[in-house]
């Protein structure tokens, strides 16, 4: 038989995986948000984001928003597998995503007690969409931004970046149009992961592997040019 490691992707690095694959979807979201803010002539360092979710995509979107764009993350949300409900976690000085990574389990459940001790305010899971923010990043569940939840959105919101698959319903799309909110659709916004899977196949075929910076630079170019 022939050795063809590129037939499936998302492999560990030792088995022919690609650097940057873990971060790719979340960082891809941020590359598209950066371009949207440029288009709208908004200073990313003065912007605030509210994020739904704290799985892989939301984690790296939060990190990217703070570390790459210089913005502030007002909140993230997560499903608490112990309480069987979702919560929103916010902090008056902005969420520290690197800290939250130290208190989240492998399933995306944030340690509620540790968060409270660190000064985080814990609210109902739907509270994320009500926050005073310039950018909303739904990165959790399909259809959560809909005719009902858009009524709770702050008038400050200028960008909705679809980190999840299908997080916004057609009714939400109509709301965005009516209120001049710039919507980055999921098939572009969250394409960083599948694009980097393609990069993984390319590297497998060449049997030559790029550094993380090389992968992420190529991803940025592919998504924004």
Please name every model-derived segment.
Residues 1-17, 32:
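N-terminal ligand-binding/catalytic initiation module
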Residues 1-5, 34-42, 66-71, 81, ...:
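Generic secondary-structure signature for well-ordered alpha-helical cores
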Residues 5, 48, 71-75, 134-135, ...:
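Structural motif
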Residues 13-21, 182-185:
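A short glycine/serine-rich beta->alpha loop
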Residues 20-23, 27-130:
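Glycine-rich phosphate/diphosphate-binding loop of Rossmann-like nucleotide-binding domains
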Residues 57-61, 144-148, 168-170, 191-193:
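Short glycine/serine/threonine-rich phosphate/pyrophosphate-binding segments
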Residues 122-133, 143-160:
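Rossmann-fold NAD(P) dinucleotide-binding segment
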Residues 139, 154-225:
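Adenosine-phosphate binding glycine-rich loop
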């Amino acid at each position: 038989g022939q050795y063809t490691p590129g037939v499936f992707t998302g492999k560990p690095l030792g088995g022919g995986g690609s650097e940057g694959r873990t971060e790719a979807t979340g960082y891809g979201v941020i590359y598209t948000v950066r371009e949207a803010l440029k288009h709208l002539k908004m200073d990313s360092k003065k912007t605030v984001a509210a994020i739904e979710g704290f799985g892989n995509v939301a984690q790296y979107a939060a990190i990217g928003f703070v570390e790459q764009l210089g913005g502030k993350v007002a909140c993230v949300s997560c499903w608490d597998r112990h309480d069987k409900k979702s919560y929103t976690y916010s902090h008056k000085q902005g969420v520290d995503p690197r800290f939250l990574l130290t208190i989240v389990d492998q399933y995306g459940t944030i340690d509620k007690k540790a968060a409270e001790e660190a000064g985080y305010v814990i609210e109902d899971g739907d509270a994320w969409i009500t926050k005073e923010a310039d950018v909303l990043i739904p990165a959790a569940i399909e259809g959560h931004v809909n005719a009902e939840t858009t009524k709770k959105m702050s008038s400050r919101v200028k960008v909705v970046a679809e980190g999840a698959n299908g997080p916004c319903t057609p009714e939400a799309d109509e709301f965005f149009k009516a209120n001049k909110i710039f919507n980055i659709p999921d098939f572009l916004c969250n394409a960083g992961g599948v694009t980097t899977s393609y990069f993984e196949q390319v590297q497998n075929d060449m049997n030559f592997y790029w550094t993380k910076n090389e992968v992420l630079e190529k991803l940025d170019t592919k998504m924004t040019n």
